[in-house]
Design a protein with these regions (language model features):
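Non-catalytic linker/capping segments at the edges of enzyme domains
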Residues: 1-45, 49, 150-152
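HotDog/MaoC-like acyl-thioester-processing domains
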Residues: 1-11, 80-83, 97-99, 104, ...
Length: 152
């Protein structure tokens, strides 16, 4: 007699985002935190510290871009537990990020088909609500589980 193999439940988006955060050195370096995670949407927060400033005292654009990449990467990988990598992104800087404030990154999956996905990330000052940047990113899914599915 062959024993039946129980079905394997894929991890949910929040579990995947938490796992990615715990295993991502850039997430730790930027002192990010998870505010919300669901399938197709992730919201992260990052304090704007003096170490992230440019020559003129505003948040360095490259740090804003790195944070946005984390936001849409977490969103894409968590939606279906399939590994993906950023293949392109475009950023529109709208206002300077101010040292001493918190930057919020709200990423949303806008389209996904086959091995490709498009994501929008809205980056805003948490206190004032001022929009700091908007990023449009493209993800290429390379296959494989982000984290292995767990048996119930």
């Amino acid at each position: 007699m062959i024993d039946a193999v129980p079905p394997v439940a894929p991890p949910d988006a929040e579990t995947i985002v938490r796992w990615m955060a715990a295993n991502n050195p850039v997430f730790a370096l930027l002192k990010c935190e998870i505010r919300h995670a669901s399938s197709g949407r992730t919201c992260l927060a990052m304090p704007i510290t003096p170490e992230l400033a440019n020559t003129f005292g505003a948040m360095h654009g490259g740090m804003i871009f790195a944070f946005a990449d984390l936001c849409f990467g977490f969103t894409a990988n968590a939606a279906q537990n399939v590994k993906g990598v950023s293949s392109s992104a475009e950023i529109h800087w709208l206002a300077p990020g101010k040292v001493g404030t918190t930057l919020i990154g709200d990423a949303k999956e806008t389209w996904r088909e086959g091995r490709n996905g498009l994501y929008d990330v809205y980056l805003a000052d948490e206190e004032s609500g001022e929009m700091i940047a908007i990023v449009h990113g493209r993800m290429r899914f390379i296959g494989g589980d982000v984290i292995p599915a767990q048996s119930d």
